[in-house]
A protein has these predicted regions:
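Short amphipathic beta-strand/extended segments with alternating polar/hydrophobic composition
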Residues: 15-18, 45, 77-79
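Residue-level signature for short turns and capping positions that connect secondary-structure elements
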Residues: 14, 31-33, 81
Length: 84
């Protein structure tokens, strides 16, 4: 299966990043937000879009998971070792 270079979900543009054969993910950056314990968290609407992207990619037969890192980044990581 060939992956789309960019995917827009709920108005958020996720960019495909292919660093290595085992390091492939979609990423999108929102505002830096903080929870009640002052830990960084993704924007709620961006996180919902990431979860929807997970659902889309799973329906396409991929094994994926969503995560977030610092500075507002959200990633949807693709497990490329699943028969592709």
């Amino acid at each position: 299966m060939e992956l789309c270079e960019n995917i827009t979900v709920n108005g958020w543009d996720f960019e495909l990043v292919e660093n290595d054969v085992d390091d492939v993910f979609y990423q999108c950056r929102g505002e830096v937000m903080y929870d009640d314990e002052h830990d960084e968290m993704p924007e709620p609407s961006l996180w919902r879009a990431a979860q929807k992207l997970v659902d889309i990619l799973v329906k396409d037969g991929l094994r994926v998971y969503a995560g977030h890192s610092e500075k507002g980044w959200v990633e949807v990581t693709i497990n490329m070792n699943n028969g592709l």
